[in-house]
Amino acid sequence: GFQKGGKAAQWRDEDMAQLFLQKAKQFVVDNKERPFFLYYGLHQPHVPRVPNERFIGKSGMGPRGDVILEADWCVDEFLKELDRLGLAENTIVILTSDNGPVLDDGYKDQAVELVGKHRPAGPLRGWKTTMYDGGVRVPFMLRWPAMVKPGVSDAFVCQMDLLASFAGLLGQTY
């Protein structure tokens, strides 16, 4: 493929998750004294699904499972950083996705063969790229210890409402 940026734009795929985590943590450190917004988009489990060496073989589900473990580790490390900085209590953290799961995206990593009886979309029909519920219904987890008691809800959430919701929380119009 075509890539701009010369050597500065090149990295080892195995190091992407760690690099993005380090950048996210540094942003929080640099902005801890004032309100901030950070969009921290996890690369995993998108292709190339190449886990860091310390995650290879850990899931028993091949590279796809290993990078999902790596993504989980990254989220945990980021939350620990918020705790370490004393920011966790009053920081809103949302973990969500832009689409449902996909197993067979043409990337030959044994995802289909190793899935066993696990159903990534649960009982829903469809996957990413379909308009069925399995393709468009996504997880939405919110953590805000100062204001939201931990629990489970089956309430409908539309990501398009997030801008208006955050503006309202901040007393702003958009």
Locate the predicted segments by residue.
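Amphipathic, non-transmembrane alpha-helical secondary structure
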Residues: 18-29, 76, 80
